[in-house]
């Protein structure tokens, strides 16, 4: 199968083995529990390897109060086998993505979208990640826009609350997000 980054969606990362019978603890990166609870085909991607391998999800259940699922995968029968999968990503094909409501987005759609200041039109940076907490946060890699900043070796990143008041425009067709950053927010990337 051709490996195209856009055809895969990460749903979690295997963080450890659980018990002696091959169960795995998976840190979820999805808001859809059925991706762990409904058996079927998933893909495993080893660290530093762009080529996922198909595997069957046998079962999965959430750990109460945590963003962790305990899953069973076909062919993983003991703790030693489970331990070898630490750090692997669990993926689904993007054709399996659920339909979203208006103004809902999949994380993979937002990564690498350019971020502009809503009022000035100035290019500010690029979305590099999204953190799902109480309120979603966009992580933005800021561009260097002055000689002083260009001399800094440290990358400048900021977290922007992904709420309409701060992010009024998401235009995926044009690879553009516009933000109204509160005063001082962008300078936080300097520290």
UniProtKB/Swiss-Prot annotation:
- Source organism superkingdom: Bacteria
Q: What is its main location?
A: cytoplasm
Q: What compartments host this protein?
A: Cytoplasm
GO MF terms held by the record: ribosome binding
Q: Which GO terms describe its biological process?
A: ribosomal small subunit biogenesis; rRNA processing
Q: Which Pfam families does the UniProt entry name for this protein?
A: PRC, RimM
Q: What is known of its domains?
A: The PRC barrel domain binds ribosomal protein uS19.
Q: What's this protein's name? A: Ribosome maturation factor RimM
């Amino acid at each position: 199968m051709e490996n195209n980054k856009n055809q895969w969606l990460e749903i979690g990362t295997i963080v450890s083995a659980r018990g002696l019978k091959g169960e795995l603890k998976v840190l979820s990166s999805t808001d859809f529990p059925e991706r762990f609870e409904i058996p079927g085909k998933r893909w495993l991607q080893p660290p530093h390897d762009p080529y996922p391998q198909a595997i069957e999800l046998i079962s999965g259940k959430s750990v109460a109060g945590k963003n962790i699922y305990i899953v069973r995968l076909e062919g993983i029968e003991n703790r030693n086998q489970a331990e070898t999968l630490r750090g692997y990503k669990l993926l689904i094909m993007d054709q399996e993505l659920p339909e979203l409501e208006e103004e809902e987005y999949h994380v993979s759609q937002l990564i690498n979208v350019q971020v502009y200041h809503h009022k000035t039109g100035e290019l500010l940076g690029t979305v590099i990640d999204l953190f799902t907490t109480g309120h979603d946060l966009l992580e933005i890699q800021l561009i260097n826009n002055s000689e002083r900043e260009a001399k800094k070796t440290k990358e400048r990143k900021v977290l922007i609350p992904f709420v309409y008041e701060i992010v009024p425009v998401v235009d995926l067709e044009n690879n553009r997000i516009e933000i109204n950053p509160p005063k001082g927010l962008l300078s936080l990337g300097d520290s």
